[in-house]
Design a protein with these regions (language model features):
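A generic local structural motif
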Residues: 7, 64, 125-127
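Short, exposed beta-strand "edge-strand" segments with a Pro/Gly-rich flavor and a Y/T-containing core
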Residues: 15-16, 83-87, 161-165
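Short coil/turn segments at beta-strand junctions that form active-site/ligand-binding loops
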Residues: 16-18, 73-75, 134-137, 154
Length: 180
């Protein structure tokens, strides 16, 4: 288990300055989007063609806000989302790029420890323990409190499942990153 998780972090040999631990549902989409006709589409290899439902729906406005944050602060992305499960880093980069997000900034995943009873905070902690010497600081962006893991190097910012990544949360993160 430990070896498998170390391989999943994909952090060996990467010199990182700042990290965004990024969840997807409740961050780049909103709970009410589940009923949106925009969630249905007709030709996407990430969705099951038989049900024509986009399992990876992204609100373009929220994605633009995340993209601007990543670009403005030169952040690298580590995915904590369940969307990462069963995908390679390259496949997930393509998924992000196809959804208005900077896939080129994705450098890896937290390990999937859910089957071992790990919370998202535990997965983030595991990642940080195995890559700490390379990380200057980090931000965790998630709609669930179970991802809350703060240290002197980083901070958790919670979004709302129903509102996603709002301007208010964006302002708080920007103030945090500017004052470090």
């Amino acid at each position: 288990m430990v070896r498998k998780m170390a391989e999943e972090t994909n952090c060996q040999g990467i010199h990182i300055v700042k990290i965004l631990f990024l969840d997807m549902d409740g961050v780049v989409n909103k709970g009410r989007d589940n009923a949106s006709p925009n969630r249905y589409r007709y030709n996407d290899k990430w969705s099951n063609p038989s049900d024509r439902f986009d399992l990876y729906y992204v609100d373009p406005e929220l994605a633009a806000r995340v993209s601007a944050l990543v670009t403005d602060f030169d952040l690298r992305i580590i995915s904590t989302s369940t969307w990462r499960c069963g995908k390679t880093v390259d496949e997930f980069k393509e998924l992000l790029n196809n959804r208005f997000l900077p896939g080129d900034r994705l450098i890896g995943f937290t390990p999937d420890g859910e089957s071992e009873g790990m919370s998202r905070a535990d997965e983030i902690r595991y990642f940080l323990l195995h890559c700490e010497e390379d990380i200057e600081r980090y931000v965790i962006l998630d709609d669930e409190k179970k991802a809350n893991y703060c240290t002197p190097k980083g901070r958790f910012f919670q979004t709302s499942f129903y509102k996603g990544y709002t301007e208010k949360v964006d302002t708080r993160i920007r103030e945090y990153l500017e004052n470090r």
